[in-house]
UniProtKB/Swiss-Prot annotation:
Protein name, per record: NAD(P)H dehydrogenase (quinone)
Family assignment from sequence similarity: Belongs to the WrbA family.
Pfam families recorded: FMN_red
EC number: 1.6.5.2
Annotated source species: Hydrogenovibrio crunogenus (strain DSM 25203 / XCL-2) (Thiomicrospira crunogena)
One Gene Ontology MF term: NADPH dehydrogenase (quinone) activity
Superkingdom of the source species: Bacteria
InterPro entries, A to Z: Flavodoxin/NO_synth, Flavoprotein-like_sf, Flavoprotein_WrbA-like, FMN_Rdtase-like_dom, NQO
Cofactor detail note: Binds 1 FMN per monomer.
Residue span(s) of domain Flavodoxin-like: 4-191
UniProt keyword annotation of Protein transport present: no
Binding site for NAD(+): 12
Length: 201
């Protein structure tokens, strides 16, 4: 059984929604087992409530050491000035032991994101995140253009060859669109298929 982890941080629920879509896509591949987890919050409960953080997320909290248990990891993060959020950065900074032991070498890695605006750093967030995956020795996978929704020019939409993405809007009111959800599912399917082949080799 090929094991895929969808690991994310979501402040207002947009990345959480995308994570569920990616997990659905990955889980549709025969012989693949999918787990959804999230990284810990750095804010106190009081700070999080004041900031409007979505606290009722069902995904359990992950620990850095368990990353080695999976054949593929699909990371989800909102953007912070074109980079990953502090919560994800803090989590990855605790993986030095995994890196030193080569525990993530030849595992499949992929990234998805959410931004507030159309040009809010979707691609830079994903590609800068890839640097970490290269250091781990992971096989980096994005979204192929065989996913038809990638070429949709009829609406403002997220979705890049580097990874799925969504636009939250300046006030967070915009939810992932049908097109963005379909791209997220495509990413899940693609990563799962690559991981299945890799784990069988």
């Amino acid at each position: 059984m090929t094991k895929v982890l969808v690991l994310y941080y979501s402040m207002y629920g947009h990345v959480e929604t995308m994570a569920k879509a990616i997990a659905e896509g990955a889980g549709s591949v025969e012989g693949v087992e999918v787990t959804i987890k999230r990284v810990p919050e750095l804010m106190t409960d009081e700070q999080a409530k004041k900031a409007g953080v979505k606290l009722d997320q069902s995904a359990p909290i992950a620990t850095p050491s368990e990353l080695a248990d999976y054949d593929a990891i699909i990371f989800g993060t909102p953007t912070r000035f074109g980079n990953m959020c502090a919560q994800m950065r803090n989590f990855l900074d605790q993986t030095g032991g995994l890196w030193a032991g080569g525990k993530l070498i030849n595992k499949v890695g992929s990234v998805f994101t959410s931004t507030g605006t159309q040009h809010g750093g979707q691609e830079t967030t994903i590609t800068s995140f890839h640097t970490n995956l290269f250091h781990y020795g992971m096989i980096v996978v994005g979204v192929p253009y065989s996913c038809q929704e990638m070429t949709n020019m009829n609406e403002i939409t997220g979705g890049t060859p580097y990874g799925a993405s969504t636009l939250a809007g300046g006030d967070g009111s915009r939810q992932p669109s049908e097109n963005e959800i379909k791209i997220a599912k495509c990413q899940g399917v693609h990563v799962a298929k690559v991981a299945k082949k890799q784990s069988a080799s």
